[in-house]
């Protein structure tokens, strides 16, 4: 005797896989573009972690140009960019407890100049981006393990 298994299905115009900075930014931009064009667009984001940022383990020195374009009023919306990078130092660790630093001359490598950037927790930033996405109508599903994604091409 064979048993039929009930399959839950949900339909969205766009499914974004992954709740990191790229996936969240994509979902936000899609909803912004839909709003600019007075069009309805259903967007969901699926994340394998139990919460947004659960698998983001690093800190970050964040350059905000892309965020200025994506969410121009990010400061007013409380983005967790509270610690400006004030100086660049290269630190040499001789042992676990003994180190010394030397100022980094950014004219040798201008791409490493962090003036105007922020030191932050990338996980906290992703959680903030998720809130912005939800405010735009993106549905976020956490701890998601999906077996199959059905796609349909629109002609």
Give, region by region, the residue ranges found by the protein language model:
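A short, basic/flexible loop-to-alpha-helix module at the beginning of a structural domain
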Residues: 1-11
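Catalytic cores of large soluble enzymes that bind and process phosphate-bearing ligands
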Residues: 12, 18, 22, 26, ...
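N-terminal Rossmann-like FAD-binding beta1-loop-alpha1 element of flavoenzymes
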Residues: 13-44
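Glycine-rich, histidine-containing beta strand-loop boundary motifs that form or position
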Residues: 19, 47-49, 142-144
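Short, glycine/charged-enriched secondary-structure capping and boundary segments
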Residues: 30-32, 58-61, 105
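N-terminal FAD cofactor-binding segment of flavoenzymes
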Residues: 40, 48-97
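Feature captures the FAD/FMN-dependent oxidoreductase FAD-binding
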Residues: 81-155
